[in-house]
Amino acid sequence: MPNFSGHWKMKQSENFEEMLKALGVNLMLRKIAVAAASKPAVEIKQEGETFYIKTSTTVRTTEINFKIGEEFDEQTVDGRPCKSLAKWVSENKMACEQKLLKGDGPKTAWTREMTNDGELILTMTADDVVCTRIYIRD
Protein backbone atom coordinates (compact mmCIF):
# COMPACT_ATOMS: atom_id res chain seq x y z
CA MET A 1 0.00 0.00 0.00
CA PRO A 2 1.45 3.40 -0.94
CA ASN A 3 2.04 6.12 1.63
CA PHE A 4 0.06 9.21 0.64
CA SER A 5 1.06 11.07 3.83
CA GLY A 6 2.78 14.41 3.49
CA HIS A 7 2.48 17.99 2.33
CA TRP A 8 1.90 18.38 -1.38
CA LYS A 9 2.14 21.29 -3.83
CA MET A 10 0.58 21.37 -7.27
CA LYS A 11 2.94 21.04 -10.21
CA GLN A 12 0.41 20.94 -13.05
CA SER A 13 -3.33 21.34 -13.66
CA GLU A 14 -5.45 20.58 -16.73
CA ASN A 15 -9.16 21.28 -17.38
CA PHE A 16 -10.04 22.73 -13.96
CA GLU A 17 -12.09 25.59 -15.42
CA GLU A 18 -13.76 23.22 -17.91
CA MET A 19 -14.79 20.95 -15.04
CA LEU A 20 -16.26 23.90 -13.11
CA LYS A 21 -18.18 24.89 -16.25
CA ALA A 22 -19.58 21.34 -16.53
CA LEU A 23 -20.75 21.68 -12.91
CA GLY A 24 -22.68 24.84 -13.82
CA VAL A 25 -20.42 27.33 -12.01
CA ASN A 26 -20.90 30.81 -13.52
CA LEU A 27 -18.08 32.62 -15.33
CA MET A 28 -17.22 35.09 -12.56
CA LEU A 29 -17.05 32.39 -9.87
CA ARG A 30 -15.03 30.15 -12.21
CA LYS A 31 -12.42 32.88 -12.67
CA ILE A 32 -12.19 33.41 -8.89
CA ALA A 33 -11.97 29.65 -8.26
CA VAL A 34 -9.31 29.10 -10.93
CA ALA A 35 -7.16 31.93 -9.51
CA ALA A 36 -7.65 30.79 -5.91
CA ALA A 37 -6.98 27.13 -6.69
CA SER A 38 -3.84 27.78 -8.74
CA LYS A 39 -1.57 26.94 -5.79
CA PRO A 40 -3.48 24.71 -3.40
CA ALA A 41 -1.69 23.36 -0.35
CA VAL A 42 -2.61 19.75 0.35
CA GLU A 43 -1.89 17.86 3.56
CA ILE A 44 -2.57 14.14 3.74
CA LYS A 45 -2.37 11.96 6.82
CA GLN A 46 -2.72 8.23 6.29
CA GLU A 47 -2.94 5.48 8.87
CA GLY A 48 -3.50 2.22 7.04
CA GLU A 49 -6.80 2.63 5.22
CA THR A 50 -7.86 5.77 7.10
CA PHE A 51 -7.22 9.14 5.47
CA TYR A 52 -7.36 12.82 6.41
CA ILE A 53 -7.02 15.22 3.47
CA LYS A 54 -6.88 19.00 3.94
CA THR A 55 -6.85 21.22 0.85
CA SER A 56 -6.23 24.93 1.40
CA THR A 57 -6.57 27.77 -1.11
CA THR A 58 -6.82 31.53 -0.67
CA VAL A 59 -10.63 31.27 -0.82
CA ARG A 60 -11.49 28.16 1.18
CA THR A 61 -10.17 25.15 3.04
CA THR A 62 -11.75 21.72 2.86
CA GLU A 63 -11.08 18.77 5.13
CA ILE A 64 -12.23 15.19 4.71
CA ASN A 65 -11.77 12.13 6.90
CA PHE A 66 -12.55 8.72 5.50
CA LYS A 67 -11.76 5.04 5.56
CA ILE A 68 -11.49 3.01 2.38
CA GLY A 69 -14.70 1.04 1.85
CA GLU A 70 -16.84 3.15 4.22
CA GLU A 71 -19.28 5.85 3.10
CA PHE A 72 -18.49 9.40 4.27
CA ASP A 73 -19.78 12.96 3.92
CA GLU A 74 -17.95 15.52 1.81
CA GLN A 75 -18.68 18.23 -0.76
CA THR A 76 -18.29 18.24 -4.50
CA VAL A 77 -15.65 20.61 -5.85
CA ASP A 78 -18.38 23.25 -6.30
CA GLY A 79 -19.52 22.89 -2.67
CA ARG A 80 -22.61 20.66 -2.89
CA PRO A 81 -23.01 18.11 -0.06
CA CYS A 82 -22.65 14.49 -1.08
CA LYS A 83 -22.09 10.96 0.20
CA SER A 84 -18.85 9.45 -1.01
CA LEU A 85 -17.29 6.00 -1.08
CA ALA A 86 -13.58 5.43 -1.75
CA LYS A 87 -12.20 2.07 -2.86
CA TRP A 88 -8.82 0.78 -3.98
CA VAL A 89 -8.85 0.17 -7.74
CA SER A 90 -5.18 -0.83 -7.92
CA GLU A 91 -2.22 -1.12 -5.57
CA ASN A 92 -1.44 2.61 -5.88
CA LYS A 93 -4.82 4.14 -6.77
CA MET A 94 -8.06 4.88 -4.94
CA ALA A 95 -11.29 5.94 -6.63
CA CYS A 96 -14.22 7.71 -5.02
CA GLU A 97 -17.77 8.03 -6.33
CA GLN A 98 -19.91 10.90 -5.07
CA LYS A 99 -23.72 10.93 -4.74
CA LEU A 100 -25.47 14.27 -4.29
CA LEU A 101 -27.66 14.55 -1.20
CA LYS A 102 -30.06 17.00 -2.90
CA GLY A 103 -30.92 17.99 -6.43
CA ASP A 104 -29.55 16.92 -9.76
CA GLY A 105 -26.21 17.51 -11.35
CA PRO A 106 -23.42 15.87 -13.25
CA LYS A 107 -22.04 12.57 -11.98
CA THR A 108 -18.91 13.43 -10.00
CA ALA A 109 -15.97 11.38 -8.80
CA TRP A 110 -12.27 11.63 -8.00
CA THR A 111 -9.23 9.39 -7.96
CA ARG A 112 -5.87 9.74 -6.23
CA GLU A 113 -2.88 7.77 -7.46
CA MET A 114 0.75 7.57 -6.39
CA THR A 115 3.16 7.18 -9.31
CA ASN A 116 6.40 5.23 -9.20
CA ASP A 117 8.35 8.51 -9.20
CA GLY A 118 6.50 9.80 -6.13
CA GLU A 119 3.98 12.14 -7.74
CA LEU A 120 0.36 12.28 -6.64
CA ILE A 121 -2.17 12.44 -9.47
CA LEU A 122 -5.64 13.72 -8.61
CA THR A 123 -8.34 13.34 -11.24
CA MET A 124 -11.77 14.89 -10.78
CA THR A 125 -14.65 14.18 -13.14
CA ALA A 126 -17.99 15.81 -13.83
CA ASP A 127 -19.84 13.55 -16.30
CA ASP A 128 -17.34 13.19 -19.17
CA VAL A 129 -15.15 16.21 -18.28
CA VAL A 130 -11.89 15.20 -16.60
CA CYS A 131 -9.62 17.52 -14.62
CA THR A 132 -6.12 16.27 -13.80
CA ARG A 133 -3.89 17.81 -11.15
CA ILE A 134 -0.36 16.59 -10.48
CA TYR A 135 1.27 17.18 -7.09
CA ILE A 136 4.80 16.77 -5.75
CA ARG A 137 5.87 16.54 -2.12
CA ASP A 138 6.58 19.91 -0.57
From Swiss-Prot:
It comes from the Eukaryota. All-trans-retinoate binds at R133, I134, Y135. The keyword NAD does not apply. Transmembrane segments: none annotated. Belongs to the calycin superfamily. Fatty-acid binding protein (FABP) family. Forms a beta-barrel structure that accommodates hydrophobic ligands in its interior. This is Cellular retinoic acid-binding protein 2. The lineage of its organism: Eukaryota, Metazoa, Chordata, Craniata, Vertebrata.
